[in-house]
């Protein structure tokens, strides 16, 4: 096992997840890994039931809407919903 290669691979997967975001200003992806297996992933976006518009224009600038959920929150919520534990897991995030 090559840790540097594994880290690079998980970051690439997080980048792919970021591409799923509808955000125009900043797309963020997240992967949660435990025992060398991906147990969850997510991206920033609007909550279920909202439109997929993550920004609003204020004074000519795109501003992230307050309802946007972080990629980490989405990944952890999916993990918990499916009954998994994040104890001992690593999280890879494309933006900090």
List where the protein language model places each region.
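Short, basic/aromatic recognition patches
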Residues: 2-27
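Zn2+-dependent cytidine deaminase-like catalytic core
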Residues: 4-5, 39-96
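Short charge-dense sequence patches
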Residues: 22-30, 53-56
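Short beta-strand scaffold segments in enzyme catalytic cores
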Residues: 27-42
């Amino acid at each position: 096992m090559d840790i540097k290669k594994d880290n690079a691979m998980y970051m690439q997967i997080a980048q792919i997840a970021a591409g799923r975001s509808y955000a125009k200003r900043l797309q963020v992806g997240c992967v949660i890994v435990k025992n060398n297996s991906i147990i969850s992933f997510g991206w920033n976006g609007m909550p279920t039931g909202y439109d997929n518009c993550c920004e609003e224009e204020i004074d000519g600038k795109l501003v992230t809407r307050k309802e946007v959920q972080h990629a980490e929150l989405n990944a952890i919520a999916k993990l918990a919903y499916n009954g998994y534990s994040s104890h001992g897991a690593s999280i890879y995030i494309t933006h900090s």
